[in-house]
């Protein structure tokens, strides 16, 4: 079943005009496995590019150069963790028609300040190059100049999103995770399929009980692992159609 723009707009109006039954907040990055990958990713981002220089450049242990590389490694790890793989803060509102929520990356204010400061330094460097070299300076540095101007207004962005309840609702519940996946076999439209996060398992349980009480056709499926949901017929049917 496909949803046209008019139907989608009607669903959105109904969702936002419905009474809010429950609200909750959560700060999350993903399932537990994603957290582990993020740790290894941040460590790799800081160590892998720089450690070869320490071993092959004959840098003495405890020297200024050594500690300089260590500082660069730590900065790389922090950048990877907080800028490229940040947590997300979700603020959910449950209604009888679905859920609307906001999604914002949790990036420290210091990171925004640093990036904006770096952008202004980049602009100053480009202007200096223009004064010394002339217009030819932007042949090589034009891209950096455009990027620098764009980053001067770098600030946190809040995204507003919705997920609607189909006539038939599937709740996949990985019992060890503080998350659920909502889906349906009524349509493959993305507005009916969403992953939701919670601050605790008790909060998740309360949400599930509320959904069961307000929706008359809920298929609740507890899972041992997140990927067990892909054994469900709705995913097998999609594979057959492809």
From Swiss-Prot:
Disrupted gene: phenotype observed: Deletion mutant is susceptible to killing by V52 strain in a VasX-dependent manner.
Membrane topology term: Multi-pass membrane protein
UniProt GO cellular component terms: host cell membrane; membrane
Protein origin, superkingdom: Bacteria
UniProt keyword list: Host membrane, Membrane, Transmembrane, Transmembrane helix
Disulfide bridge map: none
Membrane-crossing residue ranges in chain numbering: 39-59, 66-86, 118-138
Subcellular locations according to the entry: Host membrane
Function: Immunity protein that plays a role in preventing early activation of toxin VasX.
Protein name as catalogued: Immunity protein TsiV2
Species in which this protein is naturally found: Vibrio cholerae serotype O1 (strain ATCC 39315 / El Tor Inaba N16961)
């Amino acid at each position: 079943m496909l949803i046209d723009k008019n139907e989608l707009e009607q669903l959105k109006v109904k969702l936002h005009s419905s009474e809010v039954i429950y609200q909750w907040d959560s700060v999350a990055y993903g399932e537990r496995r994603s957290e582990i990958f993020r740790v290894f990713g941040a460590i790799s981002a800081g160590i892998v590019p720089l450690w070869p220089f320490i071993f092959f450049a004959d840098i003495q242990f405890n020297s200024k150069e050594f500690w300089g590389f260590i500082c660069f490694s730590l900065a790389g790890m922090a950048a990877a963790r907080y800028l490229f793989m940040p947590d997300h803060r979700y603020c959910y509102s449950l209604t009888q028609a679905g859920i609307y929520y906001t999604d914002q990356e949790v990036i420290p204010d210091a990171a925004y300040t640093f990036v904006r400061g770096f952008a202004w330094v980049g602009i100053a460097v480009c202007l200096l190059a223009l004064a010394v070299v002339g217009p030819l300076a932007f042949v090589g540095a034009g891209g950096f100049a455009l990027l620098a101007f764009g980053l001067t207004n770098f600030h946190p962005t809040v995204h507003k999103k919705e997920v609607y309840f189909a006539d038939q609702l599937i709740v996949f519940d990985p019992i060890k995770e503080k998350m659920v996946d909502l889906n349906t076999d009524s349509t493959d439209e993305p507005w009916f399929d969403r992953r939701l996060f919670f601050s605790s398992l008790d909060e998740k349980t309360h949400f599930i009980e509320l959904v069961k009480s307000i929706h008359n056709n809920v298929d609740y499926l507890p899972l041992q692992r997140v990927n067990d949901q892909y054994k469900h017929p709705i995913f097998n049917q999609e594979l057959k159609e492809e």
